[in-house]
Each structure stands twice: as C-alpha cells, then as structure tokens.
Amino acid sequence: MVLEATVLVIDNSEYSRNGDFPRTRFEAQIDSVEFIFQAKRNSNPENTVGLISGAGANPRVLSTFTAEFGKILAGLHDTQIEGKLHMATALQIAQLTLKHRQNKVQHQRIVAFVCSPISDSRDELIRLAKTLKKNNVAVDIINFGEIEQNTELLDEFIAAVNNPQEETSHLLTVTPGPRLLYENIASSPIILEEGSSGMGAFGGSGGDSDANGTFMDFGVDPSMDPELAMALRLSMEEEQQRQERLRQQQQQQDQPEQSEQPEQHQDK
C-alpha cells in the first residue's frame, strides 16, 4: 500500500451553494471528504490527511496533517461559503503544506474539488503544474458543477502535472445524475488505485479480502458496482447491529432471573 500525505482542497465558493448535486455542491464535498479520508486511512494506517479551503478572501489551512477525522470535520464546520475559488493559490498552499509534512517518506498528493469557474489563467496553472511535477506532487481533481467551462483547462493541467511513464494524477469529471458525488469517486482511479475497493471507506474495513469475498458471494464486484456493494455492506452492518441488540436484550433478561434465584432459596 502506498504511504501518502494527502491535502484535500475544497471549493467553498458561492457556486458551492448550487443544488444540482444533493444536497448542495458544498455538502456533496463534505460527504466526499469523509469518504476519501477513510479510504486513504484504510489503504495505509500511516497515511495522513490535511484540509484547505480554496475560496473566500484567501485560501486557508483548515487542518494540518492528521489521522483523526474529527479534526478534519472541525475544519469543515468552520468553513464559510463565500467568494470565488482561488485555485492556483490553494494548490500552492497545499504544496507548501506537503513540503512541511513530518514524515518525508510519505508520497505527496493533492485532491482538489472544483465546482466553480476557474478564474486563474491557463499559463499560470500550467506553470504551477510543471512545478508540482518537478517536486513529485501528484494531483487529483474532482471536476463537477461547471464542467463545460473548466474541463478543457483541467485536462491540460493534469497532462502537464503527470509523468508520462507513470500517470499518478487524475481528472474525474462528474455530471449530475442519480449517483452521489462520493459514489462516482469510489469507482474512480482516485480511490481504486489506492488498493482499496473504496466501499470499505464508510464501513471501516477498507476493502479487505473478507469483505470483498463476501460481496463476491453475492455476485457483486465492488469495483464494478460500488453502489450495490455499498448497499450490501450497509445491509450487512444493520443486520449485525440488530443481532447485537437482540443479544444484549437477552443478556439483560437473563440477569434478573439469575439474581432472583438466591432469594428464592433463602425463603425456603
């Protein structure tokens, strides 16, 4: 499993209020941030994740590298939806954050959400892409919401940041539809190349062989049908929780009966 430090960059611009992705573009990112965080941690327990907001007056670091999702969640709760996306600045801050990671053995990766029109110039972004490539920083971009305006430029950016011998950076373009944003991410190379099926992310077991084997017993390949795999996992977890509740209820019922027995002997 790849050992990585990952910086997530969220787009908290005014465009993130739009409701074409349930419930809004911003809330779709929150669900996806949790999904990616868990997938990274499940892929390798020594992976760490940081968080940056890309819009507002200036991009800012919401959480330094951590293995605790609570710190990421606190950063998300402190985020305000405002202004426009400063993509180049946010990526530069992410690169600087990666440079100061504690574990220098960790590979460097940025995962950026883009759901608003990019205002940075093409030349500026291509120069930045080449700098990131030179410093061995991989970049994944989740492009949604304003894809007609952004896709061509983001294609060029990813082409510039990628190493031809090893394409470690990816562009995922998502259109509105029945699948949630994180479900599209789950079946993309952003997650699948981590050595995790992605469906273990919310379940906490991380694409282990037992879980995948269970899915295969149902005739489901998690990498091919992540939505069905997720539904099966949730169903199995609910059944496990139901059985656990029944077991606890049975134990509670047995305890009073056991405590009453000595009293009956004393009366006799």
UniProtKB/Swiss-Prot annotation:
CDD domains: VWA_26S_proteasome_subunit
Pfam families: VWA_2 (PF13519)
SUPFAM superfamilies named in the record: vWA-like (SSF53300)
Coiled-coil stretches: none
Comp. bias regions, Low complexity: 248-261
Observed effect of gene inactivation: Cells are viable.
Keyword Ubl conjugation carried by entry: yes
UniProt keyword annotation of Transit peptide present: no
GO cellular component: cytosol; nucleus; proteasome complex; proteasome regulatory particle, base subcomplex
UniProt biased composition (Basic and acidic residues): 235-247
One GO process term, biological-process aspect: ubiquitin-dependent protein catabolic process
Role this protein plays: Multiubiquitin binding protein.
Note: Present with 17200 molecules/cell in log phase SD medium.
Record text on subunit structure and interactions: The 26S proteasome is composed of a core protease, known as the 20S proteasome, capped at one or both ends by the 19S regulatory complex (RC). The RC is composed of at least 18 different subunits in two subcomplexes, the base and the lid, which form the portions proximal and distal to the 20S proteolytic core, respectively.
Record protein name field: 26S proteasome regulatory subunit RPN10
Lineage start: Eukaryota, Fungi, Dikarya, Ascomycota, Saccharomycotina
